[in-house]
Amino acid sequence: MQAIIDAEQSFKFPVLVGDIGGTNARFSILVDSNAEPKEFPVLQTADYATIDEAIQHAILDQTAIQPRSVILAVAGPVDGDEIDLTNCDWVVRPKKMIADLGFEDVTVLNDFEAQALAVVSLEGHHMEQIGGKPEEAVATRVVLGPGTGLGVAGLFRTRHAWVPVPGEGGHIDIGPRTERDYQIFPHIERIEGRVTGEQILSGRGLRNLYLGICAADKITPTLETPVDITSAGLDGSNPQAAETLDLFATYLGRLAGDLALIFMAHGGVYLSGGIPVRILSALKAGSFRATFEDKAPHKAIMRDIPVRVITYQLAALTGLSAFARTPSRFEVSTEGRRWRMRR
């Protein structure tokens, strides 16, 4: 008789690692602990009804390699045997994956837990720094990622290992501070009466902010998508779009600074996700760093804390791969998040 159990031990190769976001899913396979990852094309989650179907058709059917272990990073909290994804209709069912796809071992982490693992695994040329001093080697770090949603995680060092701290920080309250903020915020869409970080600092948040600016200025919106708004803001062809990017950078700087204070992140704040890379020039323009540092009475501390934009699209896979290769380098709790077939 076969039974599925939790297990705390190293991973059996080959290992399939996957980063499952609200819009895109990325996968690679590690044949062994020393091999370079075998990468696969980025998938659109909307193109497949289930994650099992996506893995079968886009991964397993395209290679002769049969993974024994799987490590997935998913957008949303990991709780129970059926894991719903935030901003995506997929449901991860590890027991079903083991039964149907031939895996022996499935581990599911939070997507920004994987991003946290990545910040101490990426090479320097995969990041671009915005202000601050060089990071302190073993100091606490924070990862903040506006994309389809808004992800947040911390990373701290014990005596022997790095410990990622996942959470749902994208759903904290965010509020007005300046006179202009007070003009715009009444027009921002609320969730049960709240304006959350994700309602502004995400793809849809970018559009919410643009519509709020247009409403405050009594101007009919002419741009439909976050991509349109970003393009028009970067080239300066639309004043409201340009202000959208400036305020997006401002609010992102405020939140990043708050998180840096909470964690006292002398190891740096790391911006991941698709949006920071696309608007890098806007983040460098000044308002982001200025509001990041504007944290009296601790402005001197904030001036020293570096911010780095992760420019590598496969950062989460890098973090998961590092965990698969050298799990002893990290302290990752897999209780209730790892399923294994015992034969």
UniProtKB/Swiss-Prot annotation:
It catalyses: D-glucose + ATP = D-glucose 6-phosphate + ADP + H(+). It comes from the Bacteria. ATP binds at residues 18-23. InterPro entries: ATPase_NBD, Bacterial_glucokinase, Glucokinase. Pfam families: Glucokinase (PF02685). Its EC number is 2.7.1.2. Transmembrane segments: none annotated. One of its GO terms (cellular component) is cytosol. GO terms for molecular function: ATP binding; D-glucose binding; glucokinase activity. Keywords: ATP-binding, Cytoplasm, Glycolysis, Kinase, Nucleotide-binding, Transferase. One of its GO terms (biological process) is glycolytic process. It is found in: Cytoplasm. The keyword Nucleotide-binding applies. It is an enzyme of class 2 (transferase). Its main location: cytoplasm. HAMAP family: Glucokinase (MF_00524). NCBIfam families: glk, PRK00292.1-4. Belongs to the bacterial glucokinase family. This is Glucokinase.
